[in-house]
């Protein structure tokens, strides 16, 4: 691709976001570039004492319909779309008395921001830009002749290009690609919003008839789950882990991100101060504490200190200096929190490789998706919000009602077991997990694993949670033999009566929630 620089002699500017406009206009004026502009943009440039041609003067047609029609005119679009490499195009421009543009600077109405503000339907519709995307797409298509700029972040590039004889062909192509991404993102945002409005009015489904997402490459990662797999991080429009601020440590890996996401979600499932330690997307330990976040960390780590080695730690509260000192004694891949007490980052940074992240709370609403071959599965996020997640709605199926203290442990266990890959059994005591059985293909093995991880002493007197019903009594019997005092489970098995009978026989209290928390 040749250099083929196009000197900028004429520019069209129409921007909602006026950031950097003053410097841009002054730079163009210094190089004697003719400026054509619209509405408030033209007024702003004129206020600077810079000559500017209002677009209505160019077209001979007034702005109308409350500004809905400004630039939709042949004298504008012919000047943008003329391919100046073609003699026929140049001849037609001369006949039509239209001068070509070499630079188009446009940014669009703030549709996404208007929607986010909670504006009503009509107000959002008014912020759907028509003329702006038309000019951007036209200029991007004609990038062999025109440079298109859609972000104030590119204004310095414009100023540099003015000094070097214009943008090169390669630079114009890059700007065109950015412009098409810009309008595509805008259109996806509008289409998604409109589809969601229709879905909200449709009593048959809460899901939109069309889903579109846009994500931008943030950076390439060293590799994927395994060294032979290439990988990259793309970021979306919502804030979250992908936009986390990193204070220290090596670059995040693919596996670091997946484990951090699991840990972050697990910690924020709990309203009380909570620490979750995750390895391979499963909990090594989770604990809550009203005493301190450091206490929560101690108890979470104590659940399985062997597996916690090289794990990911997430806290839903500020990391204190006390907690930082504890973490600094343990090999940890990542620690993530909403904030850090003064001095905590410095303590953690004494460990060369630990990745220290600060992130906003995870999204606690909406839908999540998963790719399958040929399609996409979409579901409502599991936010521990089912009717059966409220202990007030639990059914006492066996034994006697437990004390408030034991009930708190059952509530904690029920919330924590959501973070465990199915089949999941979790043992808890005093607001902390003491044994976790995860990812087994039958519930008996998960129960055995949880008991084995806890050990006889910690299992005795603990409570248990099962993410789904016991299909037979054998899984429950493993827990009863280990000395648990109470268990919470969804119920719903055709053999519920056998399981409940086993609980009564063992003297174990059993609550049924009617809600399930599979995690695959």
Swiss-Prot record:
Residues 1-150 form the MGS-like domain. One of its GO terms (biological process) is 'de novo' IMP biosynthetic process. InterPro entries: AICAR_Tfase_dup_dom_sf (IPR024051), Cytidine_deaminase-like (IPR016193), MGS-like_dom (IPR011607), MGS-like_dom_sf (IPR036914), PurH-like (IPR002695). Keywords: Hydrolase, Multifunctional enzyme, Purine biosynthesis, Transferase. GO terms for molecular function: IMP cyclohydrolase activity; phosphoribosylaminoimidazolecarboxamide formyltransferase activity. Gene3D superfamilies: 3.40.140.20, Methylglyoxal synthase-like domain. It catalyses: (6R)-10-formyltetrahydrofolate + 5-amino-1-(5-phospho-beta-D-ribosyl)imidazole-4-carboxamide = 5-formamido-1-(5-phospho-D-ribosyl)imidazole-4-carboxamide + (6S)-5,6,7,8-tetrahydrofolate; IMP + H2O = 5-formamido-1-(5-phospho-D-ribosyl)imidazole-4-carboxamide. SUPFAM superfamilies: Cytidine deaminase-like (SSF53927), Methylglyoxal synthase-like (SSF52335). It comes from the Bacteria. Its EC number is 2.1.2.3, 3.5.4.10. Pathway: Purine metabolism; IMP biosynthesis via de novo pathway; 5-formamido-1-(5-phospho-D-ribosyl)imidazole-4-carboxamide from 5-amino-1-(5-phospho-D-ribosyl)imidazole-4-carboxamide (10-formyl THF route): step 1/1; Purine metabolism; IMP biosynthesis via de novo pathway; IMP from 5-formamido-1-(5-phospho-D-ribosyl)imidazole-4-carboxamide: step 1/1. GO terms for cellular component: cytosol. Belongs to the PurH family. The IMP cyclohydrolase activity resides in the N-terminal region. This is Bifunctional purine biosynthesis protein PurH. It comes from Corynebacterium glutamicum (strain ATCC 13032 / DSM 20300 / JCM 1318 / BCRC 11384 / CCUG 27702 / LMG 3730 / NBRC 12168 / NCIMB 10025 / NRRL B-2784 / 534).
């Amino acid at each position: 691709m040749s250099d083929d620089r196009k000197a900028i002699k004429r520019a069209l500017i129409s921007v909602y976001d006026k950031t950097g406009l003053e410097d841009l206009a002054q730079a163009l004026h210094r190089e004697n570039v003719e400026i054509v502009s619209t509405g408030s943009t033209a007024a702003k440039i004129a206020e600077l004492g810079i000559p500017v041609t209002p677009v209505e003067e160019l077209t001979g047609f007034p702005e109308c319909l409350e500004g809905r029609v400004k630039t939709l005119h042949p004298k504008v679009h012919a000047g943008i779309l003329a391919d100046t490499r073609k003699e026929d195009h140049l001849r037609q421009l001369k006949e039509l008395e239209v001068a070509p543009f070499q630079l188009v600077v446009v940014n669009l109405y703030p549709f996404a921001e208007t929607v986010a503000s909670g504006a009503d339907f009509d107000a959002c519709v008014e912020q759907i830009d028509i003329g702006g995307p038309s000019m951007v797409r036209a200029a991007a298509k004609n990038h062999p002749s025109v440079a298109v700029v859609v972000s104030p972040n590119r204004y310095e590039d414009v100023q540099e290009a003015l000094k070097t004889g214009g943008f090169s062909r390669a630079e114009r192509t890059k700007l065109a690609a950015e412009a098409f991404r810009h309008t595509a993102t805008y259109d996806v945002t509008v289409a998604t919003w409109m589809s969601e409005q229709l879905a909200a009015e449709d009593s048959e489904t809460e899901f939109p008839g069309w889903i579109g997402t846009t994500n931008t490459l943030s950076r390439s990662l060293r590799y994927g789950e395994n060294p032979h797999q290439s990988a990259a991080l793309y970021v979306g429009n919502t804030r979250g882990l992908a936009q986390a601020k990193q204070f220290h440590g090596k670059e995040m890996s693919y596996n670091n991100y997946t484990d951090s996401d699991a840990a972050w979600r697990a910690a924020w499932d709990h309203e009380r101060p909570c620490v979750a330690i995750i390895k391979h997307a499963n909990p090594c330990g989770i604990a809550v504490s009203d005493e301190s976040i450091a206490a929560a960390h101690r108890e979470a780590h104590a659940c399985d200190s062997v597996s916690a080695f090289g794990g990911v730690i997430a806290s839903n509260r500020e990391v204190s200096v006390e907690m930082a000192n504890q973490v600094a004694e343990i090999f940890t891949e990542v620690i993530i929190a909403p904030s850090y007490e003064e001095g905590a980052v410095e303590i953690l940074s004494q460990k060369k490789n630990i990745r220290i992240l600060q992130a906003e709370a995870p999204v606690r609403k909406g839908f999540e998706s998963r790719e399958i071959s040929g399609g996409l599965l979409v579901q409502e996020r599991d936010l521990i919000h089912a009717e059966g997640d409220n202990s007030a709605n639990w059914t006492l199926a066996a034994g006697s009602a437990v004390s408030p203290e034991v009930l708190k442990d059952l509530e904690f266990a029920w919330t924590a077991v959501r973070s465990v890959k199915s089949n999941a059994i979790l043992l808890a005591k005093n607001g902390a997990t003491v044994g976790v059985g995860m990812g087994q293909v039958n519930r008996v093995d998960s129960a055995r694993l949880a008991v084995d991880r806890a050990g006889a002493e910690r299992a005795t007197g603990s409570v248990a949670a099962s993410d789904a019903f016991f299909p037979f009594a054998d899984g429950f019997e493993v827990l009863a033999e280990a000395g648990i005092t109470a268990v919470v489970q969804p119920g719903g098995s055709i053999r519920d009566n056998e399981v409940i009978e086993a609980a009564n026989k063992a003297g174990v209290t059993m609550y049924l929630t009617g809600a399930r928390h599979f995690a695959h």
